[in-house]
Structures are given as structure tokens and as C-alpha cells.
Amino acid sequence: MAGVLFANLPCSLQLSPKVPFRQSTNILIPFHKRSSFGFNAQHCVRSHLRLRWNCVGIHASAAETRPDQLPQEERFVSRLNADYHPAVWKDDFIDSLTSPNSHATSKSSVDETINKRIQTLVKEIQCMFQSMGDGETNPSAYDTAWVARIPSIDGSGAPQFPQTLQWILNNQLPDGSWGEECIFLAYDRVLNTLACLLTLKIWNKGDIQVQKGVEFVRKHMEEMKDEADNHRPSGFEVVFPAMLDEAKSLGLDLPYHLPFISQIHQKRQKKLQKIPLNVLHNHQTALLYSLEGLQDVVDWQEITNLQSRDGSFLSSPASTACVFMHTQNKRCLHFLNFVLSKFGDYVPCHYPLDLFERLWAVDTVERLGIDRYFKKEIKESLDYVYRYWDAERGVGWARCNPIPDVDDTAMGLRILRLHGYNVSSDVLENFRDEKGDFFCFAGQTQIGVTDNLNLYRCSQVCFPGEKIMEEAKTFTTNHLQNALAKNNAFDKWAVKKDLPGEVEYAIKYPWHRSMPRLEARSYIEQFGSNDVWLGKTVYKMLYVSNEKYLELAKLDFNMVQALHQKETQHIVSWWRESGFNDLTFTRQRPVEMYFSVAVSMFEPEFAACRIAYAKTSCLAVILDDLYDTHGSLDDLKLFSEAVRRWDISVLDSVRDNQLKVCFLGLYNTVNGFGKDGLKEQGRDVLGYLRKVWEGLLASYTKEAEWSAAKYVPTFNEYVENAKVSIALATVVLNSIFFTGELLPDYILQQVDLRSKFLHLVSLTGRLINDTKTYQAERNRGELVSSVQCYMRENPECTEEEALSHVYGIIDNALKELNWELANPASNAPLCVRRLLFNTARVMQLFYMYRDGFGISDKEMKDHVSRTLFDPVA
């Protein structure tokens, strides 16, 4: 199989040096003055068809003489009947889409307002990125209360940080609690409130606040037993019982004898019994985050050996404050002063959050489809993360964090890799236990959904030979599927608007099926601007969960969709004017063909690329159907010769006018590509494009010959031809010159038919197509597909085994495609690599369940509608 998987397609295609563009002289068809990509371009209107055909002795258009209107003896009988359903998207619907000229004045005013708002939001978000320091987050009443406990180091008996005590007095909520007002979780509110009560009681301040706080705790404490375990803050069972004991000693009137409280005390005792003191004092563990709950077992001098470089204990102000009160450690005080210099009169539940903030902000703008506005900011953020990337251990939420976690490490590995940074998946070995299972950090007792989701997403960008990525994919897939099946896709690290929806999308549409526009549409609906995370208390990431991202994403999606609708109208108009509506043998799918590129190369700057891609796709489908189901073998050979000579007169002897419609559509469109390609690239590309089309038709002819002879090739022989006939290379190479990048030959050869990259695109596309079409093709008499060829070559093999073999080839090739996309050494522009990679991905989407192109009135109809026609609210 190595020959199939790795051999490059032989090709002698070379671009001509810069020469004046010449029109073919075989027939006189002048170029139109407008670009072939303009919305008013008309390459093949009916009157022109008649005129041109008259020039070569043909007196009727395809619209005037259909094959079923020919005399009986001249009527052609199709070799095969594919029997596809008619067009899903009718012309009247496409024509009804808002015209760019309707209500021009009011529409212009609205567009101007929207564009101004978009520009404002972009500037505001750019400022957010540029102002990222150690992390923007909300106050933690719990941690602020612990810092407020610290007595003055001058021995005056006053608080060392009086502003924090004043913050507590000023920030009690109306219900008597302390905590994040935007969300109510009983565990979180009671914990925050109890911490503030203890501090006020210690300083004998705020009697009224204490009374209201006690009433709140008494009223809500028992609610904790009914709250989901995943809403319990980190370290709760360690710190809360210890604080209750302290509250009791201070005389706070609380329901200490509730059965639920006794259960929490028992959990604490069991946990403490499991903690070897030598581990606590000699190893970096998550216990450092909650030392205030372990005061009765900690050796305070020994524990300072585990202090982080910034003076904190696992970035926790509460834990650090507790250590300081026991040790007077100056580095602890330095850390607390540092945090308060940032926030003034309060502290967050952990700080810094610099790596977490940057990675999640980048991920957010990418998933929402607005990352193109922030290329500079993304580069700066990822350079920052890479500066602190630990290839051996991974990373945590902050640069100084001594305990890496799989959540931040997996997110960083995936994003850095896709942006061309050299990062190894070996780092994931740090997050496995003796059984091979993955954990978030050492000593973890629960498996979270978000950390598994990020590890799952990371595993999708696997390179060849990365066993650990495959194992991570298997592990996380099982965990996430189980969570969905049990209706338990909720997390102990985050409270999100629609985490189950995120998980469901990720499982249904993994990386190689998840197209950018579909992901953006889905994430716009799932994104919560008030999402919160759970540490020791609820906390917000203000530069991650931010309403500005969502507003920009919605405005931008609808703006881009409006552009796509205009381009859809152009493609459908071109289809009609070329006479393709009247072809009786082909699938009427111009909208789906446009969708296949708009769903990935969606940005406005790729308009010309999209138009070329969609037109080429349409032509390839027409010619595929022509060679598959309509033309006689003799006529098809004449058609191929006409294309080789670029001369319609070769078809003079052919009575079937539909072949001439096909030729003129191809001829005019590709000549238009040549004209515009000369402008884009500064040299003639028409000869190059013609060679590409010749190669495609040669593959179609071979398949027609096989069909006529009922010949079944070997598996390798089939694949070598079929990866050409799938036409993905043709589609890519007819649109690649319109990405806005100059492509000299030394670059072009890295992505054209001479490259492994395009070979893999074609291979995966052909094979996934076969897995969903071979049965229908077999039922209508076609003998050749990868599945059938493999079974014929291996007669002992079952159909399921043959399919498994084909899927195995696809899986390996997709991993190689990941490498071709992300290869740091590649000279090919990223947008060009994206074009190839997304062509492979859209095939995985189209053929996910069935032949989504032939049968486009089911899942694909919804995808097309959500991408092109339904605006986001």
C-alpha cells in the first residue's frame, strides 16, 4: 500500500513565464470586459451560445433541442441511471435573496452603521488583547477575607491590608451573602460568606453584616447537599469543615449538627488520612492550593520549600496569606502586595492567569470565526505562551505555576501546533496514571468534562506515529460519549451556557469534519458571555467570556453571509446562463458546490477563490456525470480531444448538443480563469489549467473504458486513477491562483500535483466518497470502487473488512494531512494550505453519513441553510 499512500502523482505541469495573454484562435469567443469573478459577468448567455454554435455549423441551442426530442434512431440511451433528486434550492428562492440594489439608500445606511459597529468592536477587542497582563478576573470574597485576616507586621494590631477589610464591609449582597452576583451556587455562596463572617468576627467589625450573613448561611447551608457534586469548589471538603470549627469557636450561631455537615467532616477526615505527610511537604500537589484548610497538619517551615517562584502557593492568595500568618515569610508578603497592586482592595481566587487567559481568548475568537481581525494579537499571545512552554512538563494556568495541568497543556499544544510552533505531543505523558488513563493534574480524584474536551480536541491534530494522541482520542471519546449518554456532560471546572452542546458538536464533528462556518455558527449559539469557572470559588475570565466577542461574531457572521448570498446568486446565474439548467443527465447542485468552499474559505478577501472553486466544482460534476451516465464512449473521446485541442470544432460530428453546452461552459469559464490568473499572478496560467483539465478527462475516459469493458482493476490501479477522477486536484488548482498570494513554481510544486499534500487530499476524498457511494453504484451496475476492488483482490475478505481497510487508509492519510497543514518548515502560504486541507475536510463532512452531495436534501440541506441563508439572531 505504500505505493498508493505516498507516491506523488506524475505531472509535468509548469507555469509559463510572464507572456502576453493570448486567446485561443480555434473559435472566436472574445472575453467579456468584466472579470469572470464579477457578479455581472456573463460567459455564455443563450444568444451567444447560438451565435457561437452558428460559427461552427450548429444551429440550435441546448435549450431548443433536448435528447428526448431527437428522432428515435438518434436518441441516446443513458448507460447508467443515477436517479438523483432534483435541485434542493430552487431558482426562485435564490433570486429572492436580498438584492444588493434593493432599497439601496436604506440598506447602505444600515450597512454603514453595522460596519462602524464592527470596527468599534474590533478596536475594543484588540485593546483587550494588547492590555493582557497577568489576567483580568473578578474578586474572590473568600480569598479577600483570608488576606484581610493578616495583622499588621508593625505590631499595631490593625489589619495589614485594611482596604480588604473595607471591601468586605462594602460588598455584601442584598441577600446577606458574599460572592459572584451573576450566578448562585450554594457551595460557592456559603463558602464565601462563611469566610467573610470569620474575618469580620476576628476584627470585631460589621455587626449588621455579620447578622445578615449568619441568617443567609443558616437558610442556605442545607441546600448544598442537593447541589451537584460538580458545583463543589476545589478543596471544599478540606477548607469548609475547618472553617466551621473556627466559626464554632468564635460563637457564630450556625447549624453545625446537620447530617450533611457531619458527612463533610467525615470526608475531610478520610482525605487527610490518605495524605502522607512526606508527600504534602515534599511534592508539588494540588493541596498547596488549600493550605488554609490543613493548618492542623502542616509543618510551616517545611512547606515553604514548595513555594512558587512568585512567592505564592499555587497562585492562591488565601493559601499564601495563611502561610504568611504562620511564617512571616517575606516572599509571601511580596506576592500579596503584588496582587493588591493590581486589584486595589480585593484579590481573586488565583493569580496570575496569564497563560490561561491568552490561550482561551485565542480559542474563543477562532471558534467564533472572528480571528482574522486579530492576527497580530494572536501571534503576540501565542509567542508569549510559547516563551513559557515547558516541553517536558506542560503548562498550567500561569507562567509560575509549578503544577501543570492537561487542560492548559492540551489547549496550548493544539493551538500552538496549528499555528506552526514546534511542539511535541510527548508532553501529554505527564498526565497519565499507572493504568494509562489521563488526568487533569497529579492527585486528581475526579475526571472533568472540559479538560477531557480540550484533550479530545487536541488529539484530533495528531501527526503520523503519535500513539499517545491516538490513545488520548480513545480515552476522551469514551468519557465524553458516556457523559452525554448519562446526561452528565457538566463540569467541575466550569459552569457554561451549553457545555453538553459543545461536547455533542465536538463528538459529531471532529476536527476533520468541523468546517469553520459550521463551528462558528454552533459556537455563537453555545457561547456564554457570563460563563464562569470554578476554583476555590466561582471566578470569571473577563477577557474570555465577554459580550464583545459574541456581538462581533454575530455581526460578522451575518455580514459575511450577505456577501455569500450575492456570490451564490452569481454562481446560480452563471449556471443558468451557461445552459447547465437544461442538461438532462447531471446533478443540479450549484448551491451545494458554492457551499463546499464558502463553509471554509469564508473570508471576504477570498471571494475570487470561492467563485473559481465553485465554478470548477460545478464543471467537474457535470463532466463526471457526462462521462459516467450520458455520453457514448466515442463521443467522450471526441470531447476529450476537443479539450486537449481547446477547439469546439472537434465536436462537429457529435449530434448531442448537450456535449457542446458542456464544452462551451468549460471553455469560457477556464479562459476567464486564465485572464484573471494573468492579472493575479503576473504570468500566463491558462496552459497550466488546460493540462489539469486534460488529466481529469483522461481519468474519466479510463473509467468509462473500464465500465464499457466490465473491467475491474486492482486496488492500486483503481486508486491511482480514482484520486484524479475525484476532481479535487482540479478544483483546487483552478482556484489556487486567486488566494491573493503569488505562487512561483517552487511554491506551487509544494501544493500541486507534484506534491504529497494534494495527493493526500485526493486520496482521502476519493476513499471517503467510495465508502458512502459504492453500494448505490453497485446496485446500478457499476463494478468499480475501492471497496469492490479490494474485495475482488482479497476474496476471503468480507465487505466490513474491506471498509475497515479503506477507513484505515483514510485515517492515516488524515494524520499526514495534519502535518502538511501545520508543518513549521512549509513555504506555502497558510491560506493555500488551508485551501487544500479544507477541501479534504469538506469531503469528510459531505460523506459523513451518506452521499451528502447526491442526497443533499437531508443533513447537507441544514448545513447549507445555516451557513448561507439563515442569519444569526
Swiss-Prot record:
GO terms for biological process: diterpenoid biosynthetic process. A motif (DDXXD motif) lies at residues 624-628. Its cofactor is Mg(2+). It comes from the Eukaryota. A motif (DXDD motif) lies at residues 405-408. One of its GO terms (cellular component) is chloroplast. InterPro entries: Isoprenoid_synthase_dom_sf, Terpene_cyclase-like_1_C, Terpene_cyclase_plant_C1, Terpene_synth_N, Terpene_synth_N_sf, Terpene_synthase-like, Terpene_synthase_metal-bd, Terpenoid_cyclase/PrenylTrfase. Mg(2+) 4 binds at residues 405, 407. Its EC number is 4.2.3.32, 5.5.1.12. Mg(2+) 2 binds at residues 624, 628. Pfam families: Terpene_synth, Terpene_synth_C. Substrate binds at residues 271, 492. Gene3D superfamilies: 1.50.10.160, Farnesyl Diphosphate Synthase, Terpene synthase, N-terminal domain. Mg(2+) 3 binds at residues 769, 773, 777. Binds 3 Mg(2+) ions per subunit. Expressed in roots. GO terms for molecular function: copalyl diphosphate synthase activity; levopimaradiene synthase activity; magnesium ion binding; terpene synthase activity. Pathway: Terpene metabolism; ginkgolide biosynthesis. It is found in: Plastid, Chloroplast. Belongs to the terpene synthase family. Tpsd subfamily. The Asp-Xaa-Asp-Asp (DXDD) motif is important for the catalytic activity in the class II active site relevant for the cyclization of GGPP. The Asp-Asp-Xaa-Xaa-Asp/Glu (DDXXD/E) motif is important for the catalytic activity in the class I active site, presumably through binding to Mg(2+). This is Bifunctional levopimaradiene synthase, chloroplastic. It comes from Ginkgo biloba. The lineage of its organism: Eukaryota, Viridiplantae, Streptophyta, Embryophyta, Tracheophyta. The gene is LPS.
